[in-house]
């Protein structure tokens, strides 16, 4: 029995962590924050980089997940209903591979990123980070 795809378009959702946590597969752009969120919660994705993004940074973001086996990349120009259906169907036909993609995604995540940034800001504010950089030089 083929897996039934339950697709629910919404105009706006304020609780994206809950939406992502409920998803089996995420179709999205490949902005840095989105990619980071996917890896923290360990979700597989079909990533469609935004065309015209400065220095094509979204494609670079996507390639990190693709290379790790956590996502599939589809160029915006190649995305239509048939292509999307094929990508989603291929992924849902192999639930083990889909689960492995999620695990690959999770291994890339840094759940402690906010703490690391706060620590760095504190060290910079106290002059400690500048001293460490000077000592390395």
Where do the protein language model's features map onto the residues?
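Nucleotide-activated sugar donor-binding and catalytic core shared by glycosyltransferases
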Residues: 1-137
């Amino acid at each position: 029995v083929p897996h039934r795809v339950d697709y629910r378009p919404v105009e706006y959702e304020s609780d994206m962590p809950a939406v992502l946590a409920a998803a089996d597969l995420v179709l999205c752009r490949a902005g840095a924050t989105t990619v980071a969120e996917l890896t923290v919660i360990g979700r597989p994705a079909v990533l469609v980089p935004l065309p015209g993004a400065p220095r094509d940074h979204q494609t670079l973001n996507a390639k990190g997940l693709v290379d790790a086996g956590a996502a599939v990349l589809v160029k915006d120009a190649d995305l239509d209903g048939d292509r999307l259906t094929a990508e989603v169907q291929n992924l849902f036909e192999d639930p083990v591979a889909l689960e492995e993609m999620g695990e690959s995604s999770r291994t890339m995540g840094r759940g402690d990123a906010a703490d690391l940034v706060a620590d760095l800001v504190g060290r910079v504010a106290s002059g400690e980070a500048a001293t460490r950089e000077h000592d390395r030089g």
